[in-house]
Amino acid sequence: MRGILTDDDNGNPRSVQTEGGISVLYKGRYLYSKYAPEKAVKSAVLSKSLAPGTLVLACSPVLCLCLAELCASLPENCFVLGCEFDAALYDFSLKYIPLGLARFALLSPDELPKLPFMLTKRRAETKDGTPLPPAGTFRRVLRTDFSAGTQFFPQHYAALTEAAENAVARFWKNRITLIKFGRRFSRNLFRNLAHLSRSVPIERVAQSVEKPIIVFGAGESMEKTARSIRSVQSAFYIVAADAALAPLFRLGIEPDAVVCEEAQSVIAPFFLGVNGKRFRVFAGITSWPKLFDLCGADICYFSPHYDDTVFFDSLAERNIIPPVMPPLGSVGLTATKIALMLRKNDRVPVFVTGLDFSYRAGTTHARGAEAHTSRLASSCKTAPASNYDAAFTFFMQKIIGKDGTPFFTSPALLSYAQTFRAYFSQSPNLFDAGTTGIDLGLSKKSADELIRKSGNTTEAKTTAEGKDSNEAKTENRKPAVKMETAIARKDADGKAAHAKKTIAEQAAFSEQKARSVRDFYEEEERSLKRLKNILSSGQNMSENERSAEIEKLLRSREYLYLHFPDGLTASLTVSFLKRVRAEIDFFIKDIAVGKSILGNS
């Protein structure tokens, strides 16, 4: 009778001699073949052809068999990343990693969840100090199982591989976005810096909302929610994505806050009809600069981390730009992030609606949204208002929504939904009030439950009998009028004192921020003019001196070239530097505009 397989006395993995060589015994199973362990690994690992720019996920390396051969045969821009979710196997693997192994790093179990973020960073390293290749090195991900240790956490390894693939794909999608809009983002940033001194610091309003918060996107599901809460809207703090502003006004809802990230003037129609409306705007520092003129001083800026650059990091370290927000891709996700930041504590519920990330055939947004009204305005016999083209283009896919009916979504919208689930599914007291669209991974709350959460169940009834009853009660309340008046006066005095303090704080903030932005403008203008002179005339410098100075000036000014198709890193080639020289004049002009705004403030 065969004996029972056991680990060592402490339950740790141990190496054992088998017929074909050394294997590992752990949790009652062999992690390698008993007959030919190395041969089996070699056929699984070395038989795969690798293209340049491949990240190899070496899952559960354990004895690290064939690892040296794999690393030695790697093509250009390839790297092997050891991944181990089992703590005991991780400690065991450390003893078997070949010395001096190039292009390899082993991630511990607590580092593995951070891998997708590490793949999008300019600089990242493991906890033992091994540097990882910078973002943009990899174009694909390949998983290779080095042992049967992956069977202890099969879902974890599958999720890790998918997350790594999504991170690499997202980086290159963002690169395409930067090629298209990178210059616009940077120029908007330079101009919006001049408005910071007259804006409201976002830190001042953080954790200030005690009422339940509703976040409105512009999807179809927002209409039902808006109608349901219209009579009790004052019981909620309402945050709207920019595209949801017009539909909310149409439904009789006035939001307390609007979130904007759009960098172009296409956002202007979203604000038609806002005269006389009072709401606070939360705008990205890279958003359309004219937003400040539309909204006045009641605007809070935040900094979308649109690219991982030395320039952006230096602005953040010097406290010139507002607090940095993660790059979430969609204004609906950013609105959710801001809502969570605004609530007093985790006990304040936040509801999202209209974040459908999909739509029915014929309609793409809620009625009243700019996309809907422009379609109505341009409709004719041959081009009806119903937009069926959007649902049946070749890249769209059909899904079943939360209500069991078919919807259509695009790869971009689907990625936003996936990002939402990854960022917010574990957030406490965050609920989905939408009834249609893609599932967001949140607990569901109906509109009736929203109203119950707000503490308003019905509107007061005004009948003749009720009116008589109120008149009868008036006499009984007269003794309390003086006390209520005194309390109101005391409350007003307190508010006045708070207002004076706020005004003083705002004045100090404005003065300090204006000074720091002005210093930044002066410093950046000098550097740009110096770079312009070097590129134009050479400044009587030797070739080596000129190259070193150009490289130094470009190192912290990625905004000059990040939108180039080949602008992932700076280059000293003539064609690259000629394009940089052409960009300098744009930013010198933007600095002049910013200084003019500061001078008029």
Where are these regions (language model features)?
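Class I S-adenosylmethionine
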Residues: M1-L55, L63-E69, F185-I202
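Aromatic- and Gly/Pro-rich donor/ligand-binding loops
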Residues: Y157-K211, M222
